[in-house]
Amino acid sequence: LTTLGFTGHSYTQRDREYCMSPSRTAQYKATIAKLKAEYKGKVDILCGIEWDILSEDKRTGYDYWIGSAHHLYGKNTGKYYEIDFRPQDLYDCIYDDFDGDPLAAVEAYFAEVEKVAALKPDILAHIDLIKKLNATGEFFDEESPRYKAAALKALQAAKGNNCLLEVNTGGVYRGYRKDFYPGPW
């Protein structure tokens, strides 16, 4: 092992359940700085951040950053929906703000991923996170031409911006899925 990177979630006002607060972010950076000093010459320690498109934190000041999207904005309600946590939120997003068309929500999500890719993150996180709560196909058909077209368009944006793709095992590890992100389009 020559290099080890740590990555915390950036702060977002919209959803504080999974992200570091500003004070925790400062503590995180200080802890990583101590580890860098402690392991200097043995292992390169890197300090990273998973920066959500709605984050209020800066992407600078880290050794690398991982770009991500976790929310969809509903034009009808003015709400931001976290698409990977509560099934009811995804349901409400689809029916209250995408006129009951789940693939319209999917297309909007992948458009958000394209926006993140355009910012040229070092790594693009869980590019198809919207499928997390859809293991049984209860919300949308992951094999539909619209789903695949939106996913492939986001993938092309990632490629065009030289983004590395994260292979994320979180959905499997936590029992939501049997497959990783990204899917095998």
Q: Which residues make up each language-model segment?
A:
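A metal-dependent hydrolase metal-coordination microenvironment
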Residues: 1-95, 99-107
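Domain-core and long-helix interface of multi-subunit machines
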Residues: 66-74, 78-185
